[in-house]
Amino acid sequence: MQRVIIVYNPRSSKQALIQDEVIKPMRAIKGYQVGKYEVKQMPVEENAKNLTKILMDGDLILVAGGDGTATVGLNAAMMTKAKVTLGVLGYGNFNDMANMLGEHKCEDLLVDFQRGSIRQLYPLEARINGEFFRYAACYFSIGMFAESTEEFNVKDTRNSLKKGKKRLAYSIKKLMRWYFSSRKRNFLPPDIQLNDTPINNMRIAKNGRKNITRGRRTTDVLFVNSDTVAKMMKGGNYWQRKDEYLVSHGKLKNVFRLGVFMMKSILFHLPGKVMSKETKIDFSTPSEIEIQAEGEYKRVQLTELVVKKSDKAINVITKS
């Protein structure tokens, strides 16, 4: 009998829909042994490790949730020694992973699974200061964009999403308010280097007896593997490629620069460079920054960040 492990977050703003559209129907279908894993209020890595403890060869990991919940399922599928298949149904704000794979209904996903509509996904892998951090199916980011995701963990924001507000429009509105109140801050240090090359045009100037650093600072660096980022910005189908992914960075404190960057990203694709080897970000002095993968963020003390394509691929269900 086919085992299905449903991964979901009981605190999700769409918990009622997940129960009605995924959990109850799955239990009613004959021929499946259905188990559940409830995402706990702990880091992605700990949730993923706990999930691996119940996985067996042949399991279907069925994620019903947003990109954060999907990241737990992805990391468990990458970490386990069992041969598993991952399916994702989007019940979040942006649903980049679910949209990338094309599945939207539980019944359709099961039909595609039975038909063998399965492809290999090559996720990104990040290492912080030489230590493994996390896998990401869609993207990693550091800087301003990463810090903005904290807005969705604010109690008032979560309550508003649960009340059924238009999620995309509401989310964009919240992010823009946050941007205008936060854009003058320094999100990344001035001495940031990408593959040993400085990406800031900074200079030291005199202000009385003090030396001050002037110039436009980089606010964001993104590593993109998916068709979309935050639902609107266009990436590419790098997730199916063994080596390639996109690296994009920008100086986005200026409203005009942000507008140009967003217009290019929405109408065409994210500006950046396609990489086929690992990318190293480093600072001359340790800096506390925010890093996030698919909406799951963490503040870390960073001297070096290395991102590359993982050597391991996993099987994922895609729309036939």
Model-derived features: positions:
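Cofactor-binding loop segments of dinucleotide-utilizing enzymes, especially the Rossmann-like FAD-
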Residues: 9-11, 91, 319
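Short, well-ordered alpha-helical microsegments
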Residues: 47-48, 70-71, 230-231, 300
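Catalytic core of tubulin tyrosine ligase-like
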Residues: 160, 225, 312
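Short hydrophobic segments within beta-strands
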Residues: 7-9, 89, 224
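Catalytic core of DAGKc-family lipid kinases
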Residues: 16, 82-220
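ATP/nucleoside-binding phosphotransfer catalytic cores, i.e., glycine-rich phosphate-binding loops
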Residues: 212-215, 231-320
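Glycine-rich phosphate/pyrophosphate-binding beta-alpha loops
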Residues: 208, 222-234
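ATP/NTP phosphate-donor binding region
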Residues: 1-64, 71, 75-76, 107-111
